[in-house]
Amino acid sequence: MLSILLSLLSLSGTHAAPISKDNGTVCYALNSSTTDESIFPLLNGQGPHYDYPQSFGIPVEVPDQCTVEHVQMLARHGERYPTASKGKLMIALWDKLKEFQGQYNGPMEVFNDYEFFVSNTKYFDQLTNSTDVDPSNPYAGAKTAQHLGKYIAYNYGDLFSDSNPVFTSSSGRVHQTAKYVVSSLEEELDIQLDLQIIQENETSGANSLTPADSCMTYNGDLGDEYFENATLPYLTDIKNRWMKKNSNLNLTLEHDDIELLVDWCAFETNVKGSSAVCDLFERNDLVAYSYYANVNNFYRRGAGNPMSNPIGSVLVNASYNLLTQADELDNKVWLSFSHDTDIQQFISALGLIDNGVTEYSLDQVDFQNIQQLSWVTPMGGRIFTEKLKCGNASYVRYIINDVIIPVPGCTSGPGFSCPIEDFDDYITNRLNGIDYVSSCEVQQVSNTTELTFYWDYNEVEYNGPVSNK
C-alpha cells in the first residue's frame, strides 16, 4: 500500500522515480526537473501528462455516504516519440537548421551545438520507456502507465476479480501502455488480468475501440481545411522576433516550421525530460498556439466535425450499457486503452465540455469560448466513469485527468454527481437521432454494426495482431 500511496504523487503533478526495492516494496524519490510543467497544457496534448487544468473545486474523493460499485476507464497511451510522419518533418527541418556553419543568436542560439533528440528513427511512433530514454526522465510513457496502474489499484482495487478483462486497441504504443498498467495492477493486487486486443482496422466496424477507422464519411482534415486560407499573426510575430537577431542568415522559416517546433518542444520533453527548444517560445506564443490547435481539434475531432458524434456514440453507448447492466455483469471494472482521436470523439458525443459554440475566430484568441479538447487527452490522459451507490440510490460522475467534471445540467447528487434516472435522460437526449452505421456508411467496409467485445470476450478470441505504431 505504501508504494501505491507514494506513486500517487506522480499523478498529481509531482513525478517520482524508483530508487530501491526492499521486501517487495518499491520506494520512490521525488525527481526534480528544470522543465516548466506549467506549459504542458499549452502543447496540444503532445507533451507529458498533467491534471485537467480547469477545476470546479469538487473533491475527487468518493462522498462520505457513498461507495463506488462500478468503474470504467478510457485511457490514451503514455508519452511517446513523434509519429513517423511527424518525425520525418522534424528531420527535414533539422537538416535545414543545421546546414548553417555560423552561430545562431537570440532565441535560436539553442541550436548551436544542438543534438537531435531521436537517436534512431526506429523509435518513431513508440512509447518512451527506460530501455531507450534516460531512466531519470520522469515523463517516460512506461512510468506514466505504471503509476496509473498503482492509482487504479489504490482507488478501485477491491472491485477487481481474478481474470478481470482489460481491453486495448492493437496499436503498439497503446498495447504496451495497457501491458504496463496490467503488470502494475497484477503486482499490487496479486491477481491475473486478461488482456484483450481489439483490432484497429476498417473491417472491425462498430466492434472497435477506434470506430473512426470504419467511418467512410469522416473527414479528418476538416480542421486543416478551416485554416487553409488563414494568416495567423502570432506566427509572423514569432518569426520576426527570431530573425531579427539572425538577419545575416539565409534561412527561410515557414509558419509550419514554427508550429512544428512547438511539437518538437513537446516530444523532446517526452524523450529527454526537458527541451531547450521550448525556450524559443514566450508564454504568449504558446497560449496562441494552444488556442488555434484546439480550434483545429474542434473541427477535426470535436463538435465542429459532423461525424464526431456518430463515431463517439459507439463508445458512449457501450459505456451506458455497461452502467445500466452493472448489477447483472460479473465484472465491476472495465479498463480500455485507445488514442486521443477516439477519446476526443467520445467526449464530443458525451457532451461534457460542449459549450454550444459552433464557430471560432481566427483573427484573435477567443478565450471565453474555446473548447480545450487537448486538455482531455494529454499523453496518458484518462476518463473514469464511476457509478456510485449512496444509500439506496445510484449516481454517475466523471473524472477527467484527476479532476471531477460534472455532467451538464445534472449535478443534484452527492459530490455534484448525476442521479442515474436523470443520467438516463441525459444520454438518451445526447444520442437521439445519431446512427453510427448509417451516418458513416460503415457497411461499405464492414458488416459489423454493434460493439460486442465487452460482452463476448469469453467466446470470441480478441488477440490482435499488434502493430508497430
Swiss-Prot record:
Catalytic reaction annotation: a phosphate monoester + H2O = an alcohol + phosphate
Expression triggers: Repressed by inorganic phosphate.
Pfam families: His_Phos_2 (PF00328)
Main location: secreted
Active-site residues annotated for this sequence: 77, 340
Similarity annotation: Belongs to the histidine acid phosphatase family.
Gene Ontology CC annotations of this record: extracellular region; fungal-type cell wall
Taxonomic superkingdom: Eukaryota
Classification of source organism: Eukaryota, Fungi, Dikarya, Ascomycota, Saccharomycotina
Annotated localization: Secreted
InterPro entries per the UniProt record, alphabetical: Acid_Pase_AS, His_Pase_clade-2, His_PPase_superfam, Histidine_acid_Pase_euk
Post-translational modification: Glycosylated during secretion across the membrane.
Protein name, UniProt field: Repressible acid phosphatase
EC number(s) given by UniProt: 3.1.3.2
Organism: Kluyveromyces lactis (strain ATCC 8585 / CBS 2359 / DSM 70799 / NBRC 1267 / NRRL Y-1140 / WM37) (Yeast)
Leader sequence segment: 1-16
Glycan-carrying positions: 23, 31, 129, 201, 229, 250, 317, 392, 447
Gene Ontology MF terms: acid phosphatase activity
The keyword Glycoprotein belongs to this UniProt entry's keyword annotation: yes
Enzyme class, broadest EC rank: hydrolase
Alphabetical keyword list: Glycoprotein, Hydrolase, Secreted, Signal
PANTHER family noted in UniProt: ACID PHOSPHATASE PHO11-RELATED, MULTIPLE INOSITOL POLYPHOSPHATE PHOSPHATASE-RELATED
